[in-house]
Amino acid sequence: MPRIHFLDVTNRDGVQTARVNLSKFGKTMVNVYLARLGVAQSEIGFPFLFHEVPYVRAQVALADADALGDLRLSGWCRAVVADVEASTPLGLKHYNLSISTSDQMLQNKFKGRLDRAAIIRETQAAVRAAKAGGAETVGVNAEDGSRTDDGFLVEFALAAKEAGADRVRYCDTIGGDTPGRIGERFAKLASATGLPIETHCHNDLGMAVANSVAGALGDLDAGQDAWINTCVNGIGERSGNADLLSCILALRNGFGVADRVEIGDRLDLRWARRFSGWAAYAFGQPVPNNQPGVGANAFAHESGIHADGALKDHRNYELYDEDALGPFPDDWHATRGRVVLTGEYGGKAGFRHVMDSLGVEVADEELSFKLVQLCNASTGRPLTDDELRLIAAHPRELALLYPGLLA
């Protein structure tokens, strides 16, 4: 039976969000939380960019140290051979290679520099370069796929498949697709190409989650596995991307959906609230009160009829059990009243006090102490309990974020 998998793009599309910033250590924490949730794959960033190289090396080292569980790490590149060749020495085994496919983009972005034949040539060359460089899986991204006609999408996908591509990412780049349309297109494309068609949906019409679910169902109808792109808390360019938790909850609990799908990832939603709360803090974007599962009002009842029913049996007015989503963060740095913290300008006494208070065993005190200072300086905010625990457990791997620290 075909299965649904999640490929989270917080560390690529999410960090491109205007007016937000996330440090390389913050991006590392995203990968850690995705691993704890059991998500299949994280698109960790842009390995061909010079400032991403130390970060990518640190992620590969963490994966080698079993700090990221079964999480697969993938890099995003343009479908350009030079991007791929600059990336493959870093040791990533999974890639998505992106290029625009719609007439709108060919005419008004590329301005005639590339035509459809050139798009296919560039894509095939990039896929072959990735496979020659040791990639285990390669996906190709049809940017603006929702405005690309069916005929060229099939031609593009089959050409990529011939070159060795394993999946095609259908990008609803401007968020204009609708559930009925995208479901039908996915079923047709997956059937015609024999490839999984990966969802990448933006939320400009508020339908990113619905479109992602509909697209995935189209894959399943065609006998193909489905891959859904998500971001934590629905962060992303403009109005955001498909929210990770909302997609999971929809597939697990949606009427007419939950009984016909199988999720291939071994998900542990007990980390859902911790991840969401951390992301809101790290990105500086509060979680809306009505956010599914993690918003302050997601399980709140006030009106008489609802309150009475919920008190008798929460299932009267709640679709799923909040206990399955785990606790909200309760971090040391948020302690009110007298508290000793550790950070950029902290000393050894404060560092030891905080680590001891958290019950953390520090693998390398001197290196961990330096990392706390550096990570606090790069994030510009107090470090969370989970961040401190990661530093204490994997200082040598995290030191790769800061070239020269191990010299």
Segment roles from a protein language model:
Residues Q41-G45, R72-G75, G139-A142, E198-H200, ...:
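Short catalytic-loop micro-motif centered on adjacent basic/acidic residues
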Residues I174-N316:
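Catalytic alpha/beta core domains of metabolic enzymes, predominantly
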Residues I4-F6, D13-Q41, L62-A67, V81-L195, ...:
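Alpha/beta enzyme core
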Residues A65-C77:
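A glycine-rich helix N-cap at a beta->alpha junction
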Residues H51-D64:
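Glycine-rich loop at the start of a catalytic domain that most often binds anionic cofactors/ligands
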Residues I4, D8-T10, L249-L251, A258-A407:
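A mid-to-C-terminal "edge-of-domain" accessory segment
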Residues R19-G26, P47-H51, G75, A79, ...:
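Catalytic cores of large soluble enzymes that bind and process phosphate-bearing ligands
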Residues F46-F50, C77-V81, I99-D103, A142-S146, ...:
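Active-site-proximal loop/turn and secondary-structure-junction residues that shape catalytic pockets
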